[in-house]
Regions:
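Positively charged, low-complexity intrinsically disordered regions
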Residues: 57-58, 133, 156
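Long, low-complexity, intrinsically disordered segments
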Residues: 153-161
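ADP-ribose/NAD+-binding catalytic cleft of ART/PARP-like enzymes
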Residues: 27-89
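Tandem repeat scaffolds
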Residues: 1-46
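ADP-ribosyltransferase catalytic core
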Residues: 80-139
Length: 161
């Protein structure tokens, strides 16, 4: 279809399987967050009108830093990028079903509306600004919206005379 001018063409019923659609408006792009979650995620449920998602990842950071994610804690990325053009930007990563997560995988919960599908969708990973580490998959059904809020920062004690 290189250089084809399809202006006002009626393509309904056309079989384009095998056609090279790269750099056309018909090119298959990145999946929506919902599509990604349905294909690569572990599940979803509605909590307080939002879609809570279940995913998995490695317990220890594999590429940036040396973070080890502990069960029961909420983690918030110090920086988060919504850029969808590159696969490696600031954020916390979620692995798809086919993505290797090492010998100690963990289940995590995160909000679907905060998720970014980016870069090469074949990587089967996405990023989120925060997630909660679960002890087991069954914990997902008991989570509330408050469970995804980070713990308040400890305040310094006031000096007393």
């Amino acid at each position: 279809l290189s250089w084809a001018n399809l202006t006002q063409a009626d393509l309904s019923g056309a079989n384009l399987s095998g056609a090279d659609l790269v750099q056309t408006i018909l090119q298959t792009g990145l999946p929506t967050t919902w599509e990604w979650q349905q294909i690569h995620g572990q599940g979803t449920r509605i909590v307080d009108g939002r879609t809570l998602s279940l995913g998995r990842r490695s317990r220890c950071s594999q590429h940036c830093g040396s973070a080890t994610y502990e069960t029961g804690r909420v983690y918030v990325a110090p920086w988060f990028s919504r850029d969808t053009t590159t696969e490696c930007h600031p954020g916390l990563y979620v692995a798809g079903n086919d993505y290797p997560v090492g010998n100690d995988p963990i289940y995590i919960a995160y909000w679907l509306d905060e998720m970014v599908v980016a870069g090469d969708a074949q990587e089967h990973k996405v990023r989120v600004p925060r997630f909660r580490v679960l002890a087991e998959m069954a914990d997902f059904e008991r989570l509330t919206a408050a469970d995804l809020e980070p713990a308040p920062e400890p305040q310094p004690a006031e000096a007393t005379p």
